Amino acid sequence: MLEGTLRTLAGQGIAKVSARTVAAAAGVNQALVFYHFGSMDELLAAACRHGAEERVARYRGRLAEVTSLSGLLAIGREIHDTERRAGHVALIGQMLAGAQTHARLGPATAAGLDLWITEIELVLRRVLSATPFGEFADPEGLARAIAASFVGLELYEGADSEGAGRALDALQQLADLVAAVDGLGPVAQRAVRARLRRSVARPERASRSAE
């Protein structure tokens, strides 16, 4: 029934999701929807969580092997292309649209995104720890920004595929810059760290002065 709900969402849109259409997709009696879940909102929330858990589990092993930002971006591109072809991009769009009117779907969609964010954060902590950026970066915040960027790109691509491609290329350039800094010798890396410390300290001093 959860898979039937996801297929209905992706294929017909949130406006067409009902006990009847879900039951037809799942090949069951529609009375079972309310017997097992109580309401359509509860079914939608459960299906959203189920779908996210399945997708994250599929890529968890690959993400655990990533050793660089370029590697993270490479698997991100692969996930993007695979999920778009499988129809999961349309599913994300429908869940985000449904979150505006279905009270339970908003938290469930956020929880699903949090599963991705957790995995991305683990990668960022690992790959940034040995770079000059490790002590200054906010892995959790960056993970949320990356997840939000890819969701946005997945939705944006439907309107402007060329623009979405350029955005991904720009992310690759940023990853290449980080890799270039990481490839510097010890002396140069110490200079970069010192410069970053001064840059971070200036806003903090300005903030204290304003208080």
What is the meaning of each model-derived region?
Residues G4-E42, A46:
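Helix-turn-helix
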Residues F37, M95-T101:
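Short helix-capping/turn signature of helix-turn-helix
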Residues R49-R55, A64-V66, V181-D182, V187:
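N-terminal hydrophobic signal/anchor transmembrane helix of membrane proteins
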Residues V56-A57, G61-R62, R84-G93, A103-S129, ...:
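Amphipathic alpha-helical packing segments from all-alpha helical-bundle domains
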Residues M1-L6, V22, A47-G51, R55, ...:
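Generic hydrophobic, amphipathic alpha-helix propensity
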